[in-house]
């Protein structure tokens, strides 16, 4: 079946893919260009495979809404959720106050090295930690978000969708989630300060992430600290992820990218603070490819438009 603009837009929202140009041939060109960094082709093929199981797109959207509504109702009708809504949230106050709360994406942190600890799927993880039976689907109490949504549908694209999780849990008193998430991360910080690092290293603290700057340490010492942090994180009662990365400022614009060092010695690139207009030009610079007419095309006030000039993009030499 031919895929509509509405369905393409939903696909990009579901997968958190920064594409806002849905006309062909530009949409497919963007999917191919972004594949190395976002895994877009696999996700698109899965979306098409699932979409083709329906008689028409409207049937798919109705299934999507049915899953969303059923999952939301299941959470809200649970006794655990109702108890959570009656909690005195002052009980979940944090002990570490006045920590830096502005993100690290600023020029003064260019070429600085960091270790981050973040809560995976924070809204789900926090509520699941509070009470596992809040996430009971027709198939029983779920251990993961995917298991929970999988209790309402067999559509793998919907099961993997980040957007539907945000919509569902965004309808379940999110301010309380954030308070509880922050309380949990405060507890994580307490345990890490006891064994891994001093509080002066913390350059960012939020409800779902802690970031440490380690640029002043030799590489060996950085890796030793990473190992200590990772070992502590594994012992926590809920799912956390550690990242070890070098932050780069992209010359010619306000964007950044994280060069993430993986355990196998490889690196991954994650772009930050880039809008959907500039991202194609940055991708071409990373891939060392020529900018195409499609890269210069964008959608503006109901019309296709094109950049007259090509932005200057300067990236550090990549390993």
Region locations from a protein language model:
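Helical catalytic core of nucleic-acid polymerases
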Residues: 66, 77-200, 205-207
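Hydrophobic face of amphipathic alpha-helices
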Residues: 68-71, 188-189, 229
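C-terminal polymerase-core module
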Residues: 171-175, 217-319
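A generic structural motif
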Residues: 206-215
């Amino acid at each position: 079946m031919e895929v509509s603009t509405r369905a393409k837009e939903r696909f990009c929202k579901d997968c958190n893919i920064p594409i806002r140009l849905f006309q062909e041939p530009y949409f497919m060109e963007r999917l191919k260009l972004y594949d190395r960094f976002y895994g877009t082709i696999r996700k698109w093929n899965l979306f098409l495979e699932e979409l083709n199981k329906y008689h028409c797109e409207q049937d798919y959207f109705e299934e999507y809404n049915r899953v969303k509504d059923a999952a939301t109702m299941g959470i809200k009708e649970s006794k655990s959720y109702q108890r959570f809504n009656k909690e005195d949230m002052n009980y979940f106050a944090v002990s570490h106050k006045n920590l830096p709360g502005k993100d690290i994406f600023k020029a003064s942190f260019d070429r600085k090295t960091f270790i981050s600890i973040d809560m995976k799927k924070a809204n789900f993880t926090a509520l699941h930690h509070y009470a596992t039976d809040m996430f009971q689907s027709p198939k029983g109490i779920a251990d993961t978000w995917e298991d929970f949504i999988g209790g309402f549908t067999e559509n793998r694209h919907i099961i993997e969708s980040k957007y539907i999780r945000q919509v569902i849990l965004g309808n379940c008193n999110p301010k309380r989630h954030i308070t509880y998430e922050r309380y949990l991360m405060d507890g994580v910080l307490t345990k890490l300060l006891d064994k891994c690092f001093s509080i002066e290293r913390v350059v960012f603290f939020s409800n779902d992430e802690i970031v440490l700057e380690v640029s002043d340490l030799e590489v060996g010492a950085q890796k030793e600290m990473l190992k200590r942090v990772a070992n502590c994180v594994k012992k926590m009662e809920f799912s956390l992820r550690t990242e070890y990365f070098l932050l780069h400022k992209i010359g010619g614009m306000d964007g950044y990218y994280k060069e993430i060092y993986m355990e196998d010695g490889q690196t991954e690139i994650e772009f930050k603070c880039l809008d959907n207009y500039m991202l194609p030009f940055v991708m071409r610079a990373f891939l060392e490819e020529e900018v195409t007419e499609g890269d210069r095309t964008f959608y503006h006030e109901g019309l296709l438009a094109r950049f007259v000039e090509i932005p200057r993009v300067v990236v550090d030499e990549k390993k």
